[in-house]
Every structure is written in C-alpha cells, then in structure tokens.
C-alpha cells in the first residue's frame, strides 16, 4: 500500500480538469476554469480539516491554515503552488501509467506511435528505472506543472492531520492562478498570508532546490507600415513585416534560449504577426544580473531607435516592462530558509540539486514582498507539452520533504 494513498488519485483527478491561463485576459484569474477549480480545492481543503479556508476575490488565491499542535512558538511556514497550466492543449487529459519502468524502453504515448518518449531524445528518462511514471496520451500536456505541487501540498496537510504525533507549527498554504502567464503573484497578499517564509512546490526532478531566478522584462513592439499598391510602391511603401524582420535581425543571433544555458541571458521572440500595413512582436528579455537586464533593455530600446532613424520617426514603438527580479537578492540574506529545505532533503536521503532557475516562479515576486520563497521539486519533467511526465515516487518524496522540513523547523526553534 502506498504511504500516501490519496496522493495519486488526487493528482489524476486534478489534471483532468482544464485550467489553462490566458495572457490576453484582463480578469483575475484569467480564466473561469481556474475559478471553478479553485473553489473545488476549497472544498477539498475543508474536507481534510484545514482552518480559515478562503478565496480572495482580488487575487484568485485560495489560502488555508493548519494550526500548530505544539506549545511553543516557531516560525510560520508556507507552501504555495499554482493551478493553471501552460499554453498547450489541456482538454481531455488522458493519463497513462507505466509501472516499474525499465529506464531504457521507448514509451508509446498515442496508439499510432506518432509521439513517443524515447530515452535517446529524453535522457532524463534513464533516471526513473524501477519507478512508476505517469504520462500523457500524446494529445495534451499532463498538467504536472503544477498540479503535482497542488496534490502534494494537500496530501502533506492531510497527513499531518491524520498523524497528530508529528509536531509542527502553524502552516499556511496558498493555491493560486496565472503563474504560467507571469501575473499570478502580482496581487498576492503577503500581509494576509503572514508567514515567516514559504516554498513554492513548483520544481522539476527530485532534489531540485532553487533560490536564484532570472531578472525578467517583457517587450511589445508595434510597427506602423505604409501600404500602397505594389505597382506604385517604389520609394513609398514601408512593409511593416520587413521592418519586423530587420528589427529581429538586429539582435545577437546566439543570445536566444536555444543557444544559451547556465547563467547566460537571452532575448526571445515569442510572437510576430501582421501585414504590410502593421506588425506586432512580443519578446521576453532575461538575465541573471540586474545590471545585465538593464543593459539588454537599453540595447532593445536602441534597436527601436535605429529602426525609426532608418524608416522614419514613430514607425516603431517598443514598450518594455519589468516582470520580476532575481529572488537571490532577497534569499542571500535568508539562507537559513534554503538550508532548511536542503537539510530536510539530505535527512531523507535526497541529494539536493541547487541550481539557478532559467525562468521565474511565483516566489520571484513573493520574496520581494517580504516572504523569502525558494522553489522545491514537485516532479514534473518535460513541462508544457505532450512529452510531460512525472514519477509517482518523486511526488511521494516531495511530500516526505515537506513533512521533514516542518519537523526540523520545530527542532531548531
């Protein structure tokens, strides 16, 4: 019998509910499916016996409290995860379970075998010999990012309630929307959450522990062309699409996601659409160093300036907006929070994998709101697409880690 017998049933139930976020929406949360799912989670939290379960209409967060069962006061710990999934088909998720995976075989996702998980293409599969994997059927993403985290947090709280002999302080949990579109934590109420520190359960493989993220900005580029009939176009037409091509060509070709790793930053063209008359581009700009981000933003603004000098003032409008900052700026003064997670992992024979996140987490913003919030593994591999999978054993270890962190929090305070 599984140690956490409701963990996987919860997860499988959650991933079959479609909860994609929508970056073009103006509501909070961005989609009604998230609202419905969050209210369902409220019922689950009440059912297991958590206190102060509530939904915040202003930010879309469901929060709850597991009251302390000890006499002394220890720091209040929080756990956070997000309910939305990435911009890939998430309707009709049909998970497959592969027991005792041998670490070598190709896993056929769809019946026709058009989509497969091949260890030659995905060498991370070799790490899961002997484990139970949950995959997609090739037509959707899985939603392990981050419904693994949701299921793990609720399971850990349920386990504490069922095992009062395990001593713990106050624990707050927060389940929120819209992380995938980068706005979920914008309106997070840190004062109401009121923890001394927290962890997002939103990482990947076992042992992952992250307290460094990118500094991030987004850029939207609007280009106004001049359209006339091609027969009369000489020295008159300004093709907005050609301007867009020239704009993109001005950026360093090797400073893109597909050619960078480690601590290297990048410029990433997300979308380009338009006509001869007008074109629109969307970029993200990333760098681990705050000064590096400012340098990249200045470069992008200079490209727009150069395009206007070439094609006429006002043709190109670049709007650059900061998104989040490297939470290491905060965590460097709170390394005890990182060490607590690291020590908990080591105590249960997990090797911590401490590395910078080539992305961001909700903790990137929440840390700057006064709650130091590193990121911990939740199990998802190959996130955001049809090749996503998760190990049952990794999910169980994530729950183990949360429990051990709380035990250490009591012992050390």
Curated annotation (Swiss-Prot):
Q: Where is the active site?
A: 84, 179 (proton acceptor)
Known EC number: 3.4.11.4
Textual note on the cofactor: Binds 2 Zn(2+) ions per subunit.
Q: Binding of Zn(2+) 2: at which residues? A: 145, 180, 384
| Record GO terms (molecular function) | metallopeptidase activity; tripeptide aminopeptidase activity; zinc ion binding
Which GO terms of type biological process are on file? peptide catabolic process; proteolysis
Q: Which GO terms describe its cellular component?
A: cytosol
Catalytic function, reaction form:
Release of the N-terminal residue from a tripeptide
Q: Which cofactor does it need?
A: Zn(2+)
Gene3D superfamilies per the record? 3.30.70.360, Zn peptidases
Keywords, alphabetical: Aminopeptidase, Cytoplasm, Hydrolase, Metal-binding, Metalloprotease, Protease, Zinc
Annotated residues that bind Zn(2+) 1 are located at 82, 145, 202
Instruction: Please name the InterPro entries in this protein's record.
Output: ArgE/DapE_CS, Bact_exopeptidase_dim_dom, Peptidase_M20, Peptidase_M20_dimer, Peptidase_M20B
EC class of the enzyme, as a word: hydrolase
Coiled-coil regions in this chain? none
Q: Where in the cell is it found?
A: Cytoplasm
Q: What does this protein do?
A: Cleaves the N-terminal amino acid of tripeptides.
Q: Which HAMAP family match?
A: Aminopeptidase_M20
Q: Which family does it belong to?
A: Belongs to the peptidase M20B family.
- This chain belongs to the protein called Peptidase T
């Amino acid at each position: 019998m599984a140690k956490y017998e409701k963990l996987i049933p919860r997860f499988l139930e959650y991933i079959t509910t479609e909860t994609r976020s929508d970056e073009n929406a103006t509501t909070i949360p961005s989609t009604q499916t998230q609202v419905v799912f969050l209210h369902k989670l409220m019922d689950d939290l009440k059912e297991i016996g958590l206190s102060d379960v509530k939904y915040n209409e202003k930010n879309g967060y469901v929060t709850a409290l597991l009251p302390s069962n000890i006499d002394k006061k220890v720091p209040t710990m929080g756990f956070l995860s997000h309910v939305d999934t990435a911009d890939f088909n998430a309707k009709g998720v049909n998970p497959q379970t592969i027991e005792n995976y041998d670490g070598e075989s190709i896993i056929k996702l769809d019946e026709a075998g058009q989509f497969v998980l091949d260890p030659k293409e995905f060498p991370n599969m070799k790490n899961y010999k002997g484990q139970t994997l949950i995959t997609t059927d090739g037509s959707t993403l899985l939603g392990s990012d981050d419904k693994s985290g949701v299921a793990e947090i609720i399971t850990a709280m349920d386990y504490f309630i069922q095992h009062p002999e395990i001593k713990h302080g106050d624990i707050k949990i927060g389940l929120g929307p819209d992380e995938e579109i980068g706005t979920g934590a914008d309106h997070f109420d840190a004062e109401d959450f009121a923890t001394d520190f927290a962890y997002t359960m939103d990482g990947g493989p076992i042992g992952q522990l992250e307290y460094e993220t990118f500094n991030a900005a987004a850029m939207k580029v609007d280009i106004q062309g001049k359209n006339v009939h091609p027969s009369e176009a000489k020295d008159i037409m300004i093709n907005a699409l050609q301007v867009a091509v020239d704009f993109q060509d001005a950026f360093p070709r090797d400073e893109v996601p597909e050619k960078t790793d480690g601590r290297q930053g990048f410029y990433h063209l997300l979308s380009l659409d338009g006509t001869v008359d007008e074109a629109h581009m969307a970029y993200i700009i990333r760098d681990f160093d705050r000064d590096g981000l400012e340098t990249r933003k200045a470069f992008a603004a200079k490209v727009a300036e150069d395009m206007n000098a070439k094609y006429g003032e006002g043709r190109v409008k670049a709007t650059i907006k900061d998104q989040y900052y490297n939470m290491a700026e905060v965590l460097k003064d709170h390394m005890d929070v990182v060490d607590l997670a690291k020590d908990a992992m080591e105590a249960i024979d997990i090797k911590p994998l401490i590395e910078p996140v080539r992305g961001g987490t909700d903790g990137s913003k929440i840390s700057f709101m006064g709650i130091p919030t590193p990121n911990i593994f939740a199990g998802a591999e190959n996130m955001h697409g049809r090749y996503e999978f998760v190990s049952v054993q990794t999910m169980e270890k994530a729950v183990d880690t949360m429990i051990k962190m709380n035990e250490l929090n009591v012992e050390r305070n």
